[in-house]
Design a protein with these regions (language model features):
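Non-cytosolic juxtamembrane linkers/loops
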Residues: 348-516
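An N-terminal domain-start capping segment
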Residues: 1-13, 245-246, 250-256
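Soluble extramembrane regions of membrane proteins in the secretory/endomembrane system
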Residues: 23-420, 937-960, 1020-1021
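Intrinsically disordered, low-complexity domain-flanking/linker segments in eukaryotic proteins
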Residues: 78-135, 143-158, 180-199, 392-398, ...
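Extreme N-terminal flexible tails
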Residues: 2-34
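Alpha-helical transmembrane segments of integral membrane proteins
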Residues: 11-14, 436-861
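Eukaryotic basic, amphipathic alpha-helical target segments in cytosolic regions
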Residues: 58, 310, 381, 770, ...
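Extracytosolic and intramembrane catalytic regions of membrane-associated proteins
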Residues: 67-175, 182, 189-193, 304-307, ...
Length: 1021
């Protein structure tokens, strides 16, 4: 009973807090201004304003949000009485006449004049010290642009072509001068300012203010934006001035390709950034989690947060490609910045949908990100000796921000965070791999020297006698642990495949039902097999055998983890390092227990002497023949004959075994009873004797009765915490990815794996747990199995996501509505849509867009994104005027010029049937060489993004000369496509309105591509 009580109490004491931490958010303080310079109420009101409409980059609402942000920044600076500058043009010097009475509408594009340079040193190579420098500068960046390419999606067969992109940015950048920054306007693009170190470098906080076209952007990324605004307020509050300068980047264009962050890199302020904090939202509400970090040094900054959350396992998932989505973090890391990626991560069912609004998040969630950001930025801005100096990778053309070291980190109950270097973990791994087996071998050697190594001991002949050998039964229980573990694990993983086959998305809304089923199944199967083995053949060595098998298996796993640490810099193996260390200590104690046993030769001699003393006893002598005080039945020949099972032994019954099952559930490992000693143990001078537990080997009577508790405390509490919270985080992040096209089996396999790892610490003691616990778990298993097989996987709180797009052929007027997702549920949604009634719904795959989904299409209601026809006139009549495209071929050359203009959109794309090798957008800035415009394999698409409405694109395109052809012999064909993404006005996209109105409550719609509506015209040149 003691084993049962202790294990139940320990598991409950750990699991309940873990679930509370996982499911709840720490309460925000009652005082909204608990930090001087922060105002939670103000931030919440800002979030409400920011998220009151869809505001993708290609929408009018996006412009309104941007203007509001400019005004809001100036209001914050005004309220703090801060002197600041404003400016737009990257080639301009900010006007110093602007002070705290500036207004957003007064921001003008400034030009360079002699007055702007008053107070500067005549020699621009020297530091020009001004008497009064503005504390902040607002850059209204309407100049920076970006040109590059990306390879087509993974899974497309054949050569991977590129998707080239030209993007015009309109970011908002706020610079807050630090006390150790230079006092001049060093960002001016005049030599030598842009090519040298400016002070000790600055720290950037980044958030994007655009949303997707189907989400209000409260969490993605409104929370990050209002947090950034509060950081502007905090660091410009008197008394909070940072040592190192702070750059607040509010970028625009993240959702469609991380374009805002990429455009920022061409701004002069980009050379000042040494460290960064990226704020994101990949869920909707909950806690903000540390997704990943560039090194251990910056991670220590986040560890200062009041409620840190995260594990390096998530960073490994990104690094190894298991997590396919990306954030602005990858842009800054590639530039050489050192920093952190902090994001909300669940529930993913609300991500990019109309439930990403203020109603479905909370002030508590906002405070969790805000308080963590303040603590992180305080650390990064005050530690001025870090993030400065030669780079560890010796890369040229990147900021000189010092040497970072790969890190390992994980939180404990959301209260504190452990951070250390990967090299430290690697050293621990090697030490455990090398030292632990040597120590166990040394202990085994010492036991053998003292003739107390009972493991694997068989029959032993008494010394100096010719009588038959005495069986010590040391092999009993030697192989039961791996066999039972394999069977239990196989059945548990088999249940995962069962759910994948019959109800593959039940984990989407009922992950705890899946967890409960998996945990209870593994526990019940393992207990039943192990308790059965103990009932049939009880062994005092069961526990030490189990620990040694765990040690051997863990050692093999640790070898793999160590290889990944060394070669691939994967840090998530810390789980197995800690696990193996705990198993080693428990196994070490298990071996040391054997020192308490009598020597084997004394046991054999005693058994032989007792055999000689018993006249008429004709059974083969063995160690259990030692006389010990107990029931007369145990001393009888009949009891002795029953001790050895045979083919005639009853499965349940017999004098010896009738008491075994009951004894197995006693309150301790063995009972202490004073008794006179006859035989072997008397030679050791013992006055009292203990009898063996149940029908275990009689020589085991002197084994300690308390060491199991020490072993369990080493194996259990800490490892249950570490494994449990990693399992909850990783599984929680993946359970709702099935509707995105991710593998449906993966969440179930992970639940099975972590269920085994969580139960594993108690497995060496499992046979001592009373039948009440497995009976309870068996009932849970039956109930959850039935539920998981028959329950509907979605609900109004956990909605299935379908991906929407409408395509229009502007030449013919034909339009097609597409819903993508898991086909079974997409067809169920379409069945309720009136315009799709009586149509033949065709479904298929399209790996070029997104793998793992089915794309179902029908003829839909015509869109009205361009209001160019009178009321009552079919929209098709105006399609041809939505976009105009003209293609001019250069005579005798493989070159053409595209003139493209479109109404009410800032985004178009040219799709080619065959690849091209070069392109140039008229008016674009010259490439800085960071990226290739076109990859070596060529591109077949050019994405074009303007910052202004109704502007014409002029694009020159060149393509290669094929073998056997001359230049000018070949042309190109394809389609010119433009996107419309503004869904704020009801009736602009009637097909989407219809889907949202008639789809079931358990479903939601989100965007499929960059545009909700895609209009196209064919070209041949």
């Amino acid at each position: 009973m003691a084993v049962t009580l202790v294990t139940v109490v320990v598991y409950l004491a750990i699991f309940i807090p873990l679930l509370i931490v996982h499911e709840t958010v720490p309460s925000a303080p009652e005082n909204p201004t608990v930090y001087r310079g922060l105002n939670l109420t103000e931030a919440w009101l800002d979030l409400a304003e920011l998220s009151n409409g869809y505001h993708p980059f290609n929408s009018r609402r996006n412009d309104e949000v941007r203007n509001w942000l400019l005004k809001r920044v100036e209001e914050i600076l005004d309220s703090n009485g801060v002197k600041y500058q404003t400016g737009e043009n990257l080639n301009a010097v900010p006007d110093l006449s602007k002070s705290s009475d500036s207004k957003a509408q007064d921001v003008d594009i400034l030009s360079v004049s002699e007055e702007d340079f008053q107070g500067e040193s005549a020699d621009r190579g020297e530091l020009g010290i001004r008497a009064e420098q503005p504390a902040a500068v607002i850059f209204n960046d309407l100049v920076s642009n970006y040109t590059s390419n990306a390879l087509t999606s993974i899974g497309v067969s054949g050569r991977k072509l590129g998707i080239s992109t030209y993007f015009e940015g309109n970011n908002i950048i706020v610079y807050i001068r630090g006390t150790e920054d230079e006092e001049e306007d060093w960002w001016k693009p005049l030599p030598p300012y842009t090519h040298r170190l400016h002070g000790k470098g600055g720290v950037m906080v980044n958030a994007h203010f655009d949303s997707v076209s189907t989400g209000y952007g409260a969490t993605d990324d409104g929370m990050g934006v209002v947090t950034a605004l509060q950081l502007v307020k905090y660091f410009t509050t008197p008394g909070n001035t940072p040592k190192r300068g702070v750059i607040v980047l509010l970028n625009n264009g993240e959702e469609d390709g991380l374009y805002g962050a990429k455009a920022f890199l061409s701004h002069p302020m980009a050379t000042f950034v040494h460290a960064f904090l990226n704020l994101e939202g990949a869920g909707a509400g909950g806690r903000a989690m540390l997704f990943r970090s560039t090194d251990s040094e910056v991670t220590r900054a986040y560890a200062k947060a009041p409620h840190p959350l995260g594990t390096v396992v998530s960073a490994d998932g990104f690094a190894l490609g298991f997590i396919r989505s990306e954030t602005d973090y990858v842009v800054f890391r590639a530039e050489g910045y050192r920093g952190l990626d902090v994001a909300f991560w669940e529930p993913r069912a609300r991500y990019h949908t109309d439930q990403d609004d203020a109603k479905h998040t909370s002030r508590d969630s906002l405070w969790h990100m805000l308080s963590a950001s303040v603590a992180t930025m305080e650390y990064l801005t005050s530690h001025t000796k870090q993030f400065v100096g030669p780079r560890g990778d010796h890369a040229t053309g990147k900021v000189k921000n010092g040497r970072g070291s790969n890190g390992v980190w994980f939180d404990l109950f959301g209260k504190t965070m452990a951070v250390f270097r990967l090299r430290t973990l690697f050293a621990w791994s090697l030490t455990i791999l090398i030292a632990s087996p040597l120590v166990l071998m040394l202990v085994s050697y010492l036991l053998a020297r003292q003739d107390k190594y009972y493991l694997f001991a068989g029959a032993v002949k008494p010394e100096g006698h010719e009588s038959e050998a005495v069986s010590l039964k040391g092999w009993r229980g030697a192989f039961r642990f791996p066999i039972v573990l394999i069977i239990s694990g196989a059945i548990t993983f088999g249940a995962a495949f069962l759910l994948r086959k019959f109800n593959p998305l039940i984990v989407y809304s009922s992950q705890y039902a899946v967890w409960s089923m998996s945990l209870s199944l593994f526990f019940c199967v393992f207990w039943f097999l192990m308790a059965g083995c103990n009932f049939v053949r009880p062994s005092a060595l069961h526990r030490v055998y189990a620990l040694l098998w765990m040690f051997a298996l863990g050692w093999i796993v640790l070898v793999g983890a160590t290889v990944f640490e060394d070669r691939y810099k994967v840090s998530g193996g810390y789980i197995f390092v800690f696990y193996q260390a705990a198993i080693f200590l428990a196994a070490f104690i298990g071996l040391c227990e054997l020192f308490a046993l009598p020597k084997k030769n004394l046991v054999v001699e005693a058994a032989h002497d007792e055999h000689e003393a018993r006249d008429g006893f004709d059974a083969v002598p063995h160690s259990d023949a030692i006389i010990s005080t107990g029931d007369a039945q145990e001393d009888s020949p009949e009891a002795d004959r029953d001790d050895e099972p045979s083919e005639t032994t009853p499965l349940v019954g017999g004098n010896g075994h009738q008491s075994t099952l009951g004894a197995s559930f006693a309150r301790g490992y063995r009972r202490v009873i004073p008794a006179p000693v006859d035989g072997a143990d008397g030679a050791d001078g013992a006055d009292d004797e203990t009898i063996a537990f149940g029908d275990e080997q009689k020589w085991s009577a002197k084994l300690p009765t308390w060491t199991w508790l020490l072993q369990f405390l080493l194996l259990g509490p800490f490892m249950i915490v570490v494994v449990g919270q990693v399992g909850l985080l990783i599984v929680g992040a993946l359970v709702q990815t099935g509707s995105d096209g991710s593998p449906l089996l993966l969440p179930y396999l992970l639940v099975s794996l972590f269920s085994i790892l969580v139960i594993l610490p108690v497995t060496p003691f499992m046979h001592r747990i009373t039948h009440h616990v497995p009976t309870f778990f068996f009932l849970i298993f039956i109930g959850t199995l039935i539920y998981n097989l028959v329950a509907f996987p979605f609900s109004s709180n956990n909605r299935f996501k379908a991906y929407f797009q409408q395509t229009v052929d502007l030449d013919s007027g034909i339009n097609q509505v597409t819903l993508a997702g898991v086909e079974e549920y997409v067809r169920e949604i379409i069945a309720d849509i009136p315009s799709a009634a009586d149509q033949n719904i065709s479904c298929g795959s399209n790996d070029k867009i997104r793998q793992g989904l089915s794309y179902c299409s029908w003829n839909g209601i015509p869109p009205k994104v361009v209001n160019n026809v009178k009321e009552g006139v079919p929209p098709e009549k105006g399609y041809k005027d939505w976009m105009s495209s003209k293609v001019t071929r250069a005579k005798g050359l493989n070159k053409a010029t595209f003139n493209i203009s479109a109404v009410d959109t800032k985004a178009c794309i040219i799709r080619f049937d065959d690849p091209f090798t070069a392109f140039e957008v008229h008016g674009a800035a010259k490439s800085d060489g960071k990226w290739d415009d076109v990859p070596e394999s060529g591109s077949d698409q050019i994405k074009l993004w303007h910052r202004d409405w109704d502007r014409e694109w002029i694009v020159d395109v060149e393509w290669p000369v094929s073998e056997g052809k001359k230049e000018g012999d070949e042309g190109r064909s394809g389609r010119v496509v433009c996107w419309w993404s503004d869904h704020n006005e009801l009736g602009a996209i009637p097909a989407l309105d219809e889907v949202q109105r008639f789809m079931p409550q358990w479903a939601a719609v989100t965007k499929l591509m960059d545009g909700l509506v895609e209009g196209s015209k064919a070209f041949i040149v």
